[in-house]
């Protein structure tokens, strides 16, 4: 059993190299974002005192389900800034989705909507509680935005859902956004 601090550090590093900088660990992602688990294990072992079993434990126990491990290959489920194709299928969203963010972002969002920035998609939550958890990672006061996903979808916007249940969209135009009740 590895210590929580090391587990968190290794998990964050895995997210970093599998989503943003595979070359930092000497890895090369394929077009779908996959890399050999053996290669990742070797890269992690050169940086941390961590076993194969502990890496698998990190993947399986990650509360955010950030990774998929299959057929001795691993990838991050979403949040990439490197050019990959997650081969996501379009899905019909629930009537409402939510986005947690910092209050300081509201003025820009109110003018321009939600943008994917350096990522492939805007990340949305299926419930307010999850959006609050996401917002809590941001500095300062937080707000929860409600996305009229049903209307967006009916008007031709595409939605996808990642392997770990995060809803994804190319963008969310301002006309589909409202500040959720109960937030500042």
UniProtKB/Swiss-Prot annotation:
GO terms for molecular function: NAD+ poly-ADP-ribosyltransferase activity; tRNA 2'-phosphotransferase activity. SUPFAM superfamilies: ADP-ribosylation (SSF56399). GO terms for biological process: tRNA splicing, via endonucleolytic cleavage and ligation. The keyword NAD applies. InterPro entries: Ptrans_KptA/Tpt1 (IPR002745), RNA_2'-PTrans_C (IPR042081), RNA_2'-PTrans_KptA (IPR022928), RNA_2'-PTrans_N (IPR042080). Keywords: NAD, Transferase. Its EC number is 2.7.1.-. PANTHER family: PUTATIVE PHOSPHOTRANSFERASE (PTHR12684), TRNA 2'-PHOSPHOTRANSFERASE 1 (PTHR12684:SF2). Belongs to the KptA/TPT1 family. Removes the 2'-phosphate from RNA via an intermediate in which the phosphate is ADP-ribosylated by NAD followed by a presumed transesterification to release the RNA and generate ADP-ribose 1''-2''-cyclic phosphate (APPR>P). May function as an ADP-ribosylase. This is Probable RNA 2'-phosphotransferase. It comes from Rhizobium johnstonii (strain DSM 114642 / LMG 32736 / 3841). The gene is kptA.
